[in-house]
């Protein structure tokens, strides 16, 4: 057995340890500037660190921040990067540290779907998407297709009822060929848009199912 007697949970020299954290739920109604305005009060309470809810760009209207759309941006409805920097400056002014939750393993399927650019690319290009490695996809299970369980029955029934519609009015540009299903938007693999609808749905990098 390894000798663990030398191990310790104490921090190394110069490391700051949170002693008392205060969690702040960031959203459009309580942004980074709102949090900054409370820095002095929280410091007076004896708080040592502000603990922020997820700070990355979530779906519009999110109140919790775990429904991430863009891992490269700070929550814009809460003030964006500039307001975030003001919060950090205010915290430092009052001797507070800042702990951020970045939830790198969280994403969401928004409406419209194209707001999540990595997911949109994955659905359009499948295994060839530059974002394919971002996702835990078992490509062998669905014959290189991504399962999207959004239907109330079979895809054949949905097509026959007219629940799945092809239109050139979606995607980031608003002019891409997409499949619509009751408000859910799915990209169409380039070059398949002229196929008959029953063939087109089977030619995509995803499989719509119940």
For each of these PLM feature ranges, what is it?
Residues 2-210:
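Acidic/aromatic-lined carbohydrate-recognition and catalytic surfaces
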């Amino acid at each position: 057995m390894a000798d663990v007697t030398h191990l310790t949970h104490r921090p190394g020299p110069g490391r700051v340890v949170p002693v008392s954290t205060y969690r702040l739920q960031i959203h459009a109604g309580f942004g980074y500037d709102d949090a900054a305005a409370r820095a002095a009060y929280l410091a007076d309470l004896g708080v040592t660190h502000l603990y922020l809810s997820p700070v990355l760009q979530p779906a519009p209207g999110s109140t919790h921040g775990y429904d991430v759309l863009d891992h490269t941006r700070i929550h814009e409805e809460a003030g964006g990067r500039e307001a975030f920097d003001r919060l950090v400056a205010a915290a430092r002014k009052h001797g507070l540290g800042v702990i951020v939750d970045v939830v790198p393993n969280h994403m969401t399927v928004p409406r419209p779907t194209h707001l999540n650019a990595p997911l949109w690319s994955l659905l359009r290009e499948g295994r060839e998407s530059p974002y394919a490695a971002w996702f835990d996809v078992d490509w062998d299970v669905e014959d290189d297709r991504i399962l999207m369980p959004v239907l109330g029955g079979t895809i054949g029934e949905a097509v026959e009822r007219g629940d799945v519609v092809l239109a050139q009015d979606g995607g980031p540009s608003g002019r891409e060929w997409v499949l619509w299903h009751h408000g859910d938007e799915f990209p169409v693999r380039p070059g398949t848009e002229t196929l008959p609808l029953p063939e087109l749905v089977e030619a995509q990098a995803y499989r719509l199912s119940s």
